[in-house]
Amino acid sequence: MWDWRVKVHIDYREKYIKEYFEKNRDFENIVETKNLEIGDIIIYINEKPTILIERKTVKDLASSITDGRLREQKFRISASSIPKEKIIYLIEGELDEKLYGRVDKKTLQGSLINTMIRDDYKVYRTKDPKESVYFLVRLINKIRNDKSKLIKIENVKEEDKIR
């Protein structure tokens, strides 16, 4: 059996998410608030940064497309040690027909498609902050409790296999 320690760092600017985890005792020894240089949430397994989550509201996505922040953030994330397949863009809110500044629905969808296809990152959509927290709780608990289902067989050394 192998050792499995999970830690989660949440950027201090993620107010709603931070407040939820600060109030929930189930996560008091797992979740810490930090000033993160990249991403909004980083999940560590055995002290190794393993999953990076960049959370954006639809409005923030639109403004980061317009001012170039999205491209710059993706560049910094791609330079990190976290594998592409473990990077998640958590997009919060509805993509409706209204304009977000100069950005329309077609542009927003195009950006999300590029994120998935060109950049090889995962995109997960939620309707609001409450659903985002629900997703994060499920993700963290899945990692904590179902580790044998999350490890790819080819990545497990013979001596680490469960007997």
Q: Which residues are covered by each model-predicted region?
A:
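Extended, alpha-helix-rich binding/interface surfaces that flank or overlap catalytic cores
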Residues: 2-7, 30-163
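Short, charged N-terminal beta->alpha structural module
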Residues: 5-27
